[in-house]
Amino acid sequence: MQRRIFLKNGTLAIAGLVLTRQLSAMTAAEPQTYYFKDDGNIPNSQFPLLVYKNVFSHRGQKGGDWLEQRFAENGWTNTWRWGVYPFHHYHSTSHEVLGCFSGEAVLQLGGESGKKMKVQAGDIIVIPAGVGHKCITHSSDFTVLGAYPFDLSPDLMKGEKGERPAADSRIAKLKLPDTDPLTGTMSGLTKIWKK
């Protein structure tokens, strides 16, 4: 009987420690910020793109499930699982979050003159409406979970002639999210994205 109680209490203590470490890592996570200027084709944004590096440990299906639950808890829904388009594009009807739960890739962020960045499982990227993104190269297992605030659906803009100024107008009218997809109301975009 004593051994059973000891094992039960020990298991609960370990589970509590793991959960505490995961939560403290998420709340302590400070995103990297990247600003991109309008390049004439891709509008980009006054708000920075946010990159959380290696902020969750789940991989594969469990990682996708964890991200979907975490994002939904923080009001980011309408999810999908796939890769990133191999051409420059942006969204004018919603902000977007991408959580990588499998593989790795090199993305170009901010349009033709933007930044090339390696992303891998464990990384989360919060993309303001208007910011260009494209996949340059990826591993065969590269997969992200995408989601949007307010259950919005994104359009697909490619920086082509005739998209603007209508796309700029839609972006300007978008409400800022109430929560960060990873940290909720504690930090992240709620502290960084200010009008």
List the predicted regions and their residue ranges:
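Short, conserved beta-strand element in jelly-roll/cupin
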Residues: 93-106
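Non-heme Fe(II)/2-oxoglutarate
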Residues: 30-56, 60
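Conserved short histidine dyad/triad with adjacent acidic residue
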Residues: 72-91
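Double-stranded beta-helix
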Residues: 136-195
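N-terminal twin-arginine translocation
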Residues: 1-5, 15-29
